[in-house]
Amino acid sequence: MEFRPYVTPERGACGGGVARVALLSLGGALGFITFVLAAYAVSETRAMRDEMEANRAYPFLTLGRVKAGYAGASAYRGAGSWHEQKPVSTDGGVTESGVSDLQAVTGNHGNVYLFGGIDTAGNVLDRVLEYDVIRQMYYTNTSLIAARARFGAGALTSASTGLVDRIVVAGGVDSSQNAITTAEYYDLSTGPSAAPGLNHDHADGCMASTGDAVYMMGGWRAVGYDWFSVSKVEKLTRTGTAWETMADMPSPRGDCAAAGLKGKVYVAGGYDDATFNHTVGFKKNLYMYDPATNTWTEKAPMKHERGDLQLVALDDTLLAIGGEIKQARPDGSHVNIVASHYVEEYFPEKDQWEERAYIGNARFRFGAAKSDWGTHVFGGSPVCKDPLDPNDYSYCDGLQMSSHEVYFELSHPDVWVNYDAAHEF
């Protein structure tokens, strides 16, 4: 029998061609429909984007700064955390020591120096404590020449090494609550020595350092039995033999806070009202002074009005902590001497403030300084009231705090949420 291999039949010329054409036509139609749908989707997406852009009705993220024409908030609003550390003590931590109306200044090696203030017995202090941030221990150093409270303090650095050479302590009030213009240097190795006296009263004023000079600003001056906030500014250089009067602040400020950052001087908050109307007296303004031109510029205000706060310079920003605020009674009247938990960070390049984690213990009239570990706050007064009259908030004696808290903030991307300026968050 003859063997023939199997041969695959050829497709019919008619049937195979029709199928091929039908498949090609169907593929082309599907491709065209896909193209049309894709083009429509792109068109609609662009139209939606343009409409949303025009209406600014949606938030979006940017890196580094808020887009021009928009308002914004840090994606890390409320960042940071506060932690209790060793309370203020004069005997190695055995007994806590409440104190208010003091100043804290960072020395070399990160240690913080606490000057003067008022204790729980109402005594105005000449005390100097050194806080070791590593061992968390307080050491009693040589006292100041004179007791003082509600004064200014700032560091002068060495022109050759950049290290703290001396700390200037100036102004404030004495043991009788009288305004004083005396000043002294505090050498970290040898203790105090006389410094040139101020030209003006600066009770409850604020001091900032640029390293090569310190600036004493604002505060109160006494006229008879009345006190008036002042706008005076004085400068003492590292080699100066007298305070030099500089351009006044844009407006008077008592109970202000100040810090030096990258060669500029900043003054935040404070109080100014001749009638002591607390509904308008507390301020949230921020003023920047340029030593190179002897001029002041008003910058973006804080989000919260307050006085007797602290302003601390970080690496590139400023941290405004705590302070005294107005508070309404049930009948609608306002009182002061009420401490706040507010914490805000200022970004000079953006001219913008952002909320940070609130401090655990509300306080005002406290000391604050930055170390290598974080931002420290020491002592201060809480919400004050007369124990015999719950509606009288003018009584603070004996309520001074020994509390010491430290603020830590992890580094994070500089991400900002942008939104329509008409919507406030």
Feature names for model-found ranges:
Residues 13-48:
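Single-pass membrane-anchoring alpha-helices
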Residues 1-15:
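Intrinsically disordered cytoplasmic terminal tails of membrane proteins
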